């Protein structure tokens, strides 16, 4: 019998935005400069990285 595949849980798109008191939505994550708006970078301890294209920015 084949082993079952593990399904990775991705964050909901609504969790990546914050809404202020006036009702304006802003992003809580950094957008990838290569991929453009809508593709967010993951925040790690020492870097920001894009999961789509692999672009990485190191924290100072």
UniProtKB/Swiss-Prot annotation:
Cofactor section: Zn(2+)
Protein name per UniProt: Small ribosomal subunit protein eS31
Classification via InterPro entries: Ribosomal_eS31, Ribosomal_eS31_arc, Ribosomal_zn-bd
Record's GO cellular component terms: ribonucleoprotein complex; ribosome
Quaternary structure (record): Part of the 30S ribosomal subunit.
Textual note on the cofactor: Binds 1 zinc ion per subunit.
Record-stated family: Belongs to the eukaryotic ribosomal protein eS31 family.
The entry's keywords: Metal-binding, Ribonucleoprotein, Ribosomal protein, Zinc, Zinc-finger
Record-linked Pfam families: Ribosomal_S27 (PF01599)
Protein residues bound to Zn(2+): 32, 35, 50, 53
Gene (UniProt): rps27ae
């Amino acid at each position: 019998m084949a082993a079952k595949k593990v399904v990775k849980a991705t964050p909901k798109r609504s969790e990546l935005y914050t809404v202020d008191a006036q009702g304006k939505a802003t992003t809580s994550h950094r957008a990838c400069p290569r991929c453009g708006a809508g593709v967010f970078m993951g925040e790690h301890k020492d870097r920001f990285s894009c999961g789509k294209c692999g672009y990485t920015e190191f924290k100072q």
